[in-house]
Amino acid sequence: MTVFIAPNRKANGFNLSTMRRYTVHQQSELQTARDSGYARVILHTLTDHELPPPESAFILDRVFIRKEEFTEAEEDAELEDDDFGLEISKVTGRPAFLQDPIYEPSSRYMWLLQLNASELEDIGPRYEGIFEDGIGHLILDKQARKAPQGAEAGYFFIQFT
């Protein structure tokens, strides 16, 4: 599974008007962002070699996410709020929202991953401004494992202040 976004790079960062197409600050914006096509989650098989992207493509460095257990302090902070989790990058757990909480209305989907922009920016300068200092959310389609290669496997959106 790979997440593709179309952030539209400009000289000093990313184009905010393009990023807004996959930004969801309130529940009523969710379906429009999902339908925009500016963020796609695609199912595919692993290969032993990469496909070369077009030369014009802006490709970020590949990042692998390693799951680590919460520290005791993080676990306490995660459970402190009845509604929201920590604003850190994490796999599963409870999502944190910087604006209104966003709920997937269908039980077919599950919240899978949260990426904090400041932690991505620590990887390298090409990530600076990628989520407008916000948080990216990956929602997984639980039926994706039955889908053919190239099918949508969920959706992705960002929130920022």
Task: Pin down the residues of each PLM region.
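Preference for intrinsically disordered or flexible, low-complexity segments
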Residues: 1-161
